[in-house]
Structure formats: structure tokens, C-alpha cells
Amino acid sequence: MRRWWAALLAAACVLVLAGCADIPTSGDVKVGQTQDVKNQDVVLVPYPPAQGEAPADIVQGFLTAATGQQHSYRVARDFLTPALAKTWNPDARVLIHDQPWQVKAVSETSIVVTVPATAEVNAEGVYTGYAAPRDRPVPFTLAKVNGQWRIAKTPGGIVLGTNYFGSLFTARPAYYFDPRWSQTVPDLRWFPARNITPLRVVQALLAGPAAPIAPPVTTSAFPHGTTVSSVQVASGVATVDLDTGSELPSLTAVTRMRAQLEDSLLNLKGIQQVQVSVGGHVEHAPTLPPTAAPPLSALVLRKGVVGTIAGSDFKPERTLGRQIAATGPQGGTVSLSRGFAAVRTPSGIEVVTAGATRVVDSRPGLIDPTLDDRGWTYSVPQADPNSWRAVDARGHVVSVAVTMQDVTSIIAIEASRDGTRMLVLASTDRGPIAFVAGIVRDTSGVPLALTSQHYDVDVPASTTALDATWVDAAGSSVAVLAQDDTGDDVTVQQLGGLPSSVGRLSMADTLVGATSLKDLRARLQNGSIAELSGAVWSTDPSVAADVLFVQR
């Protein structure tokens, strides 16, 4: 099964914060400062409150000190009244911004800071980015304690600049099951890098998945209302003590709970194995078997022959190769392990099996189809973004309900390897967009709809989007190929995470992922296949293809 994740590493750093704008005690709105820590190796060192500081200084000091995670934000708590210092929860949320905030003093004891948030992290560690900044007011009420101003009331959470966030927080996935209990599905969470603990990760896991993959898209083995009492780690083994209430889990349930916990905690604090304890009693459950790794070799159509490319070696494919080639494929998805392919041809969308080939969608203007793990083929016309169809291996056709507001055309679609999510690349009047939505199914596994809630994927507005693909076997990251005036850029983004460029290409038209970032491939318009090596794309002149297929 499972373990195909790579946590983002926080940078080691040392920075003394300084140069903050004064906050007025009355009058009109003023603009605060932002600070840039790009390309600096820094540790944030906050200052405690000084004697005689005014309310405005206390608010400014608190906002600054909240970047210091040491000792559970001890310095930040010094700016609060004793009562609030005991209850203030810095983990309630993170407001992330890259533009100055605005400050309004309502009175001597009341101040409101309005943060133009570009993203937020909620109490469960779920990151949500925004296409445009959203104003988030943060109110402060102050009172005197022993003659010194302190904050008596303010919501939980902290405010961070974008660059601070990347240094102070680290990401790791919590794992849930697909509806068939066959694979675990990653759900990225963000935690303070200095304060991340196994207990915090388990609490986030028990809180449930993010909205795009909430049930019925995924499911969890933990009974509703389950809480965690403790997580003890010894010799690489984490013992997770759970309270499942009145429901005593079965051995099957405990086995699945262990799988979710093991995937979510792997390598944190040296954890290599997990024991599940319910009410203080250790439950001895077996380990679920690993999921088979997907193919690594590129599958291509080359001079009328379908085959695999490994290095510069081309080997004709003997399972479905001839049947696929006979359709005149222009793109699509192939599952050699299942003996099944869905390809776009001059006739429309054709499904290829060892025994037959048939056209399942002949509508005009169709884009490349995608294939899920249950054998459903999805198709949609480029210019009709709300007309999705799915057809199963027996030819049963269903309409898939989607909500594509503002979308003018569909560029690419690709189902995740576990069949729980759909990657969509599309055009709008404002520019290209990409997102990942959950696939909602009935109890028989028939796809019914894509979720209206989704993960946003970054695509620069000034580019022409060309293709998108899943990067890794776990389905934790996606990549987008987009063209600007100087060439083609490939951006990789963890779902619920931050985007990063992985190098530039020239004249690319297809992007295909496999098991990890190093297996990402692109086809150029001259037929060359480019492979990623570090942050550089390399091509072998002897390796060329007319079509580069997605594999499942």
C-alpha cells in the first residue's frame, strides 16, 4: 500500500525581526509592513513586551512574537493577560499574506488589524489558497495588568508572511481510505515545524479529511467521535492509545486504523511501526499488504507501433500494443495490468481490451480520455465543459454531474491512480485554471459527480496552459505544463500545498507522471521525450514518439 509521500522540509534559519511600522492609537486606517526573508537562513527571535508600551505597541509586538514557536509561543503569550495566555490557541488558524496589513484603532483599548490573506491554514492543518487576497479582520481588546497594557481578547491563531510560513511550517499527509478499503489517500496537513508531534498529527487525522475528499470520496476506519489519549514512541514503535467510545472496533477495523496511522506517522520522530491501543489495551492487528508499484517505463506510439521506452531502448508492447496502434491513437490512458486502454482516435473515444475495440463516445471535439482504477473511462468535449460522460468495461454509460462555472473549455483531465480524485485543467475568460475535485460514486462504484469543493492548483494567469498530470503513485502531487513568451514551464504542487517550478522546456505538448517527480516526462512537438533530472530537462535525440500515453 501507501507510503509514497515526501514531507516538505523547513529551512534552518536565524533572523532578528525589526523595522515594523507604528500602529496609531486613533484615526484613519494605516498600512503595516511586510517582511521578506527570501534566500535567508534564519531563525525567528521574537522580543518580549517592554515596560510602558502603548496598546498599539503591544499589538504590534504580539503579531511579531507570534512567529516564535519556541516553548509553545511563550514570548507571544507574554503580550496577553494571564487569563488569555492560558487559553489562547496559536494553532487555531494561520493567516498568510504577502501584502501589508491595515490597522485601525477603534479606541485606546480596541484595535482591528485587517489581513489581506492569500491563504489560510485551519486548526486541522488544512491549507486553503485564494486566487485573490481575502480581507480577514483580527480584533484586539486590551486591558491593563499591573499598570501594563496587555491583550485581553483576540481570536486564536497567528499571522505570517508567505516567506515566513515556508520556513516555520512543515507539511506531511494524513491518510484516509478509498471507499473500497484498498488504498490509502493522502491529505496534506501543515504543522509548526518546531512543534510537530505524533499526537498533533493523530489529532488532525481523527478530525477527518479536507472538504474535497470528505466522505463518500474517502472513508476512515476510526469510529465517529474517536479521540486520542496519548502517543508513546519507543524504539521506532508508536503506541497510539485511542478512545472509541461505546463502539469496540473489530480486528478488521483495527487493521485499517493501524494502516492509516502508520502511513500518517511514518518517519516522524523515528516512527517505523504503529501499535493501536484501545482504552489502554494493545490490539494486535496484521499489516495490510503493499500496493503494487505502477510501471516506470514510458509507453508510447512510435512509427505506428506501441511500446515502452527505457533509456534509449524501445520494446514493442505485446499485451495490447497492436490493438491500440490499430485505432490510430492520438492520446489516452493505458492500464496494461488490467488489459484495458481508453484512447482518443479519429472516431472519438475508443476502449481497447484484449478481445475487442469499440467506440464509446463519438461526440465532436473530445479531449484525451482518462481511466480510473475501476475501469471507468471519462470523456468530455473541449468546448462543452459540463458534458462529462463515463462508461464502464461493459459499455454502460452514465452522465457525471459537474459544476464548471466560468469555465469556457476543458484542456485536460486525469483521474488519480486510486480513483478518488479528478485533475482538471481548463480555460476561463480570466485565464487558465487547474483544480482537483473528488469523484463521488454510488455504493456500487458508479461515478455520479465531481465535488464542488476542490483543491486549487496554481497556473499563472499570463500563460497558455497545455497539459496536467499526476506526479506520483500516491496522488499527493500534480504538475501543470504552461507556456509563456519565453518557453514552457512545469509547475509541481502538492495538493493542499505550495507550488514550485521544476524547470523549463521548449515546444512541449504532453506531460505524463509515473511514481515520483524524477519519473516525470514530457513530449516535445518534434517527438522527443524529455525527462527530468534535478531541475533540468534532458532529451535523447534517439528517443522519439508520436504519442506519449498516461499509464495506470
Predicted regions and their residues:
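Bimodal "functional hotspot" detector
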Residues: 7, 14, 21-552
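Bacterial N-terminal signal peptides that target proteins for export
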Residues: 1-9
